[in-house]
Amino acid sequence: MTSTSKDTPESGYAVPPPNLFGVDFGLRLLLLASAVSALVVLVTSKQTESIPTSLPPPFPAFISRDAKFQHSPAFIYLLVALSVTCFYSIITMVASFAAITSPSSSPRMLFHLVLSDAVMAGVMASAAGTAGSVAYLGLKGNSHVNWNKVCNVYDKFCRHVGSSAAVSLVASVLLVSLVVLSSYSLYRRCR
């Protein structure tokens, strides 16, 4: 008995679609690690500096100013997106582990993973882009609107915020990879 289909071997039995949930679980574990590390780096971004003033002598020559992530709505948005991504990755790791232990996974679950991963990828990409643009503005300033750069004064703060935005971008790439992987798995199961 010969078959023209590539999925049917010589014995006549259909080859099951590849189970990629081990790779899925590993990517979700990396997603959790990157989101937690970006979250910790962002939360610890605080620096206090003494800044000289140009006021006459009865006033103090230096004032103390803090730079915190709470001072920027873009960084607060990144904090919320990273927190949601952490919880999301934990929940989907449990679902992925359940799919590994079960003999056959449901196409419905794969479809839900594709949709939710795509939404989370959009949220993380927008948060990373927003925080990255504010960090770049702090690094370079904007001479057209007379916004001065602040990273020459708050160097530690800028390193923390920039690192957090970069690791958040890695989390976004991992989420896009999960969308591609889940889409491929769904395609193989429904074919």
UniProtKB/Swiss-Prot annotation:
Keyword vocabulary terms for this entry: Cell membrane, Membrane, Transmembrane, Transmembrane helix
Localization, UniProt: Cell membrane
Keyword hit for Methyltransferase: no
Domain of life of the organism encoding this protein: Eukaryota
Extracellular face of the membrane: 44-73, 140-160
InterPro entries: CASP/CASPL, CASP_dom, CASPL
Matching Pfam families: CASP_dom
TM ranges: 23-43, 74-94, 119-139, 161-181
Membrane topology: Multi-pass membrane protein
Residue spans, topological domain Cytoplasmic: 1-22, 95-118, 182-191
Gene Ontology CC, one term: plasma membrane
Keyword Secreted among record annotations: no
Record PANTHER family: CASP-LIKE PROTEIN 1U1
Subunit relationships: Homodimer and heterodimers.
Family: Belongs to the Casparian strip membrane proteins (CASP) family.
UniProt name for this protein: CASP-like protein 1D1
Organism listed in the record: Musa acuminata
